[in-house]
Amino acid sequence: MRTLFIGDLHLSADRLDITQAFTRFLDTELDDADALYILGDLFEVWVGDDIALPFALELAEKLKQVSQKLPVYFIHGNRDFMLGKQFARAAGMQILPEVKCLNLYGIETVILHGDSLCTLDKAYQRFRKLRSLSLARWLYGCLSKKTRQGIADKIRSNSKSSNQQKSYTIMDVEPNAVDALFAKTHTKHMIHGHTHRPAIHQLANGCQRIVVGDWYEQGSVLSVSAEGINLQSLPFEQAT
């Protein structure tokens, strides 16, 4: 048996090929799975459970079917932080806190989306702090659907433009932030996404940091079992 981790699928109505590949992954890759963890940014944008698009509702039905066979866990990302309990119930997903510690086959491991580790990106961290406020989230939820969609589109546009101007270092995790989280959680193994740079990092202090990749051009799946770990890419044609 094994536990699977994915993230950064960025599903949208504009890229139904990704949704199709993910659906086939759910159909073919979970027979021997103990659990599935989705580490954020399942959707490209999420402005509220009351504005779920048809493709998202269909996906919820598929995830619900999966959840009847094995637990499906979800951690919010920077794109879908407004995904709420209503959609999670429809999809059979259990929403986890921003940082979660697990015992994976005897190994204490901390999992998260990963954006909180990119501390050199000061502008984004200010936005992240604001959006985490309950009052800000409540006020946003009170806005009309059209207004929320407009704000989301503006944020996406600004983010894309800003990211093109940021350096590689700023966009990646900050080593001190990584070390601090290891110390805080008393773990030596970490799994996250967000940076879209899949890799297995063996750190000098004996810790291990694994990054799951995005699903823009191919799938990225981390499999963890008692025998070890396997970070693999999943070509879309292989998932069809």
From Swiss-Prot:
Assigned keywords, A-Z: Cell inner membrane, Cell membrane, Hydrolase, Lipid A biosynthesis, Lipid biosynthesis, Lipid metabolism, Manganese, Membrane, Metal-binding
UniProt remark on cofactor binding: Binds 2 Mn(2+) ions per subunit in a binuclear metal center.
Family annotation (SUPFAM superfamilies): Metallo-dependent phosphatases
Pfam families the UniProt entry points to: Metallophos
Group of enzyme by EC: hydrolase
Single GO biological process annotation from the record: lipid A biosynthetic process
Entry cofactors: Mn(2+)
Any Gene Ontology CC annotation: extrinsic component of plasma membrane
Entry GO MF terms: manganese ion binding; UDP-2,3-diacylglucosamine hydrolase activity
Enzyme Commission number(s) from the entry: 3.6.1.54
Reaction equations catalysed: UDP-2-N,3-O-bis[(3R)-3-hydroxytetradecanoyl]-alpha-D-glucosamine + H2O = 2-N,3-O-bis[(3R)-3-hydroxytetradecanoyl]-alpha-D-glucosaminyl 1-phosphate + UMP + 2 H(+)
Pathway: Glycolipid biosynthesis; lipid IV(A) biosynthesis; lipid IV(A) from (3R)-3-hydroxytetradecanoyl-[acyl-carrier-protein] and UDP-N-acetyl-alpha-D-glucosamine: step 4/6
Main location: membrane
Localization, UniProt: Cell inner membrane
Keyword Membrane attributed: yes
Chain sites annotated for binding Mn(2+) 2: 41, 78, 113, 194
Binding residues annotated for substrate, in chain numbering: 78-79, 121, 159, 163, 166, 194
Amino acids binding Mn(2+) 1: 8, 10, 41, 196
Topology in the lipid bilayer: Peripheral membrane protein
Reported function: Hydrolyzes the pyrophosphate bond of UDP-2,3-diacylglucosamine to yield 2,3-diacylglucosamine 1-phosphate (lipid X) and UMP by catalyzing the attack of water at the alpha-P atom. Involved in the biosynthesis of lipid A, a phosphorylated glycolipid that anchors the lipopolysaccharide to the outer membrane of the cell.
Record-stated family: Belongs to the LpxH family.
Protein name: UDP-2,3-diacylglucosamine hydrolase
Lineage: Bacteria, Pseudomonadati, Pseudomonadota, Gammaproteobacteria, Alteromonadales
Gene this protein is translated from: lpxH
